[in-house]
């Protein structure tokens, strides 16, 4: 479908009177021209990546949630480094071990239920980077300890801290090993292997944990021969530990429309994803689950005629936050806005969605760039960045698209993937749902007839 909007800019005399104003080179050019905006809907399909890198993250995701795309489970694996200058001796008397994790401040999902996490010791050292989301590392059968907390706003403590009731044997081993092991980063890493925090199967939320600058670790408590209480902490954040930190993020779409996406070459067309609240269809971007939207651009500029010059090319799409939809009006009544009771804490709309080139197998290739070589992001507008029911994403692809057409005119559609930036997949659980097909918008300039 094509929609053409034509407007005449103000005459040159008025422009001269307003010469001190900042001009819009697209809609207020010099000299005056006729501006025509042509739009065309684009095919959109949801695809799911087979795997993506989740190693050396800035933020760790933890938990389990069940939403539009099915069950998503995020599990962080990490190693620890010992303190410098700490003295641990075999003749010291063990007291206890505690685990702590700085909360990242964000929770997504149903926060009306208690959440429980379990800490396990790894049997093997985690693999070094790059590590992908489908990787796992064997762990001991019994947890070192567990912790239960309320996930609601204002209820999550800034630091999750709990005693490891099943770690007494480990604590005594650490004292017995002495400073030669406990004070040497490489030896300690080889000794402990690492830890994994796992969400209980009953959990309904995904939370963020902050591993930076000693944000997570275990604290060993003991007292010396004179009865003086002492402690030292083994923490995350050291540069040598970063390559061994990663997340396993697994999405199981069983029972949802997206269960047809069994491999990355599969695609779910927009119209085939119609459901309640989305009568025309939907397409999904969900970084934690690996979901991206494939869009196919025409191999010629919509609205191209002799005498027109393309001034700007954009891709735009409308989204609605999961759970919000509008019911059709009944005769004599107004349409009703409905909020499904899907989640107590709505998933945020990503502040930006990046565009990538792709191929017939839906592989993520180079990022689309502008004239300065910077990645092109679709920016969320007309919506609150913290809580919004809907909004519009807009991406300026002028440089990329015109350059691409000049090199490969007539060679078929240009396919792009829209998704959470690949370097931010481990830091956000943002979920974006298109409720209408995306469109390409071309702003044309043509001379004003005298």
Task: Enumerate the language-model features and the residues they cover.
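Secreted, disulfide-rich extracellular signaling modules
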Residues: 2-5, 20-450
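Sec-dependent signal peptide hydrophobic core
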Residues: 5-13
């Amino acid at each position: 479908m094509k929609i053409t909007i034509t407007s005449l800019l103000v005459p040159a005399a008025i422009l001269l009177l307003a010469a001190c104003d900042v001009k819009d080179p697209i809609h207020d050019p010099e000299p005056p021209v006729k501006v025509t905006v042509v739009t065309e809907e684009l095919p959109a399909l949801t695809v799911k990546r087979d795997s993506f890198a989740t190693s050396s993250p800035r933020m760790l995701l933890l938990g389990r949630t069940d939403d539009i795309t099915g069950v998503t489970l995020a599990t962080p694996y990490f190693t620890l480094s010992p303190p410098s200058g700490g003295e641990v001796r075999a003749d010291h008397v063990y007291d206890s071990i505690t685990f702590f994790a700085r909360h990242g401040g964000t929770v997504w999902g149903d926060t009306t239920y208690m959440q429980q996490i379990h800490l396990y010791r790894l049997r093997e050292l985690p693999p070094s980077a790059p590590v992908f989301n489908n990787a796992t590392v064997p762990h001991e059968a019994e947890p070192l300890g567990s912790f239960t907390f309320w996930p609601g706003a204002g209820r999550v403590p800034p630091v999750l801290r709990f005693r490891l009731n099943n770690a007494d044997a480990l604590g005594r081993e650490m004292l017995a090993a002495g400073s030669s092991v406990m004070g040497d980063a490489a030896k300690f890493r080889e000794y402990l292997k690492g830890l994994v925090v796992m969400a209980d199967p009953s959990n309904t939320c995904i939370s963020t944990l902050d591993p930076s600058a000693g944000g997570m670790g275990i604290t060993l408590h003991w007292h010396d021969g004179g009865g003086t209480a002492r402690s030292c902490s083994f923490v995350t954040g050291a540069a040598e530990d970063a390559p061994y930190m990663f997340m396993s993020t697994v999405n199981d779409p069983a029972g949802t429309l997206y269960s047809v996406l069994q491999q990355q070459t599969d695609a779910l067309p927009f119209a085939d994803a119609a459901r309640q609240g989305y009568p025309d269809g939907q397409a999904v971007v969900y970084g934690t689950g690996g979901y991206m939207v494939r869009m196919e651009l025409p191999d010629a500029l919509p609205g191209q005629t002799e005498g027109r010059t393309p001034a700007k090319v954009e891709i735009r799409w409308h989204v609605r936050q999961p759970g919000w939809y509008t019911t059709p009006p009944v005769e004599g009544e107004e349409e009703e806005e409905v909020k499904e009771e899907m989640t107590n804490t709505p998933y945020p709309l990503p502040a930006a969605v990046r565009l990538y080139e792709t191929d017939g197998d839906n592989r993520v290739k180079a990022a689309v760039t502008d004239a300065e070589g910077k990645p092109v992001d679709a920016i969320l507008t007309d919506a609150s960045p913290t809580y919004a029911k809907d909004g519009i994403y807009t991406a300026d692809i002028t440089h990329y698209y015109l350059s691409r057409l000049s090199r490969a005119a007539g060679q078929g559609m240009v396919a792009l993937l829209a998704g959470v930036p690949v370097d931010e997949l481990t830091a956000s659980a943002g979920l974006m749902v298109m409720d209408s097909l995306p469109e390409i918008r071309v702003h044309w300039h043509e001379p004003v007839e005298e």
